[in-house]
Amino acid sequence: RPRPASLPPRPCEASTTEVPSRRGAARATSLVPMKLAELSEARLVSHFRESFPRGERTMIGIGDDCAQVAAPEGSFIVTTDVMVEDQHFHLSWSTGYEVGARVAAQNLADIDAMGGRPSALVASVVAPRDMDADVFLDVVRGLGDRAREVGAGVVGGDLSAGEKLVISITAFGYCPGPVVRRDGARPGDVVAVSGTLGYSYAGLDLLEGGYVDPSSRGVEQLGDLAPFIETYRAPRPPLGSGVAAAAAGARAMMDLSDGPATDAARIAKASGVVIEFDRDAIEAEASQLAPAARVCAVDPVRWVLQGGEEHGMIAVFPPDAQLPEGFRVVGGVRACRADEEPQAMMDGAVLRGAWDHFSADSVD
């Protein structure tokens, strides 16, 4: 996360609201003019069973003490992430559908970053009793739709009441080939990325700075700022690019959760090397952010290097590797010099990372 967003007041929520369709593009009148307190947990679980994708490998889904998911021979991989209202998202900026799609994407990208394919997700949700049920069920739809796109099931979870919306996802997957870790980078390798860089950070600055109306949607209302706002609200990482990178011989890889500066430093520290970004390549990425940079009057290079939450891949390849479609070279790997720590650099300077929840200086 680039940095903590400001905390706008929670929107007044009428008993009936307009919420986006399943794809979040159009707006339609709610069919559930109720608060969560008016619904039983059993009724919500029944809705989950009907709405969530079962998944291609699910043997037992929602309804038992555990789900059962078929696994190929070998190992499985598992990851978890949590999103907290007013820390990671604001319901005055994003729809429930976008929040659900976003939390799914960040977990699915972690599976992809290991060179894996997702099998199943479980979701634990804390929600306020006075939350509009239609907003809550839109979160369910966003989560389910994003999982369905990659053939993963949402096979269980837990519900509780609390002061704010909190969503914790655990994702399971398997690797069709060798697992790609963070610690395989070698001197002479090239560093490449997939997906957009800096779009989400630009969208955050546009919203936080009050440069756009938070209720605005689509190109019609947002113009050339739409890609940045939409990426912040619900990123669409190139899921599958991690599997392609693994097949192409990637030696180290991560999804871009916290931005290239931070995530490259993590690979460098794990591998005991220095990663150097190429200024021209970073400037080329930054040029795509020009519409937002003009509005916010900032250097978009900062967005590119420090912006996260887009969940494309940063991968390290042998110098003679044929890069998969969608990957662009942005730097290289060299050995540490005498008295030099493993780190990420550009123009001879150590790069400062992005936002950390507990310590602004921590990279792990």
Predicted regions and their residues:
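Short amphipathic, helix-prone segments within low-complexity/disordered or flexible regions
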Residues: 2-14, 18-20, 25-28, 32
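Extreme N-terminal cap/leader segments of soluble proteins
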Residues: 31-95, 114, 123, 142-146, ...
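Acidic, Ser/Thr/Pro-rich beta/coil linker or hinge segments at domain junctions
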Residues: 36, 40, 235-236, 282-284, ...
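General beta-strand structural signal in soluble alpha/beta enzymes
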Residues: 60-61, 77-79, 153-157, 171, ...
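Small-aliphatic-rich amphipathic alpha-helix that forms the alpha element of a beta-alpha
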Residues: 96-120, 141-149, 238-244, 259-267
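Short hydrophobic/aromatic beta-strand micro-patches
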Residues: 172-174, 314-318
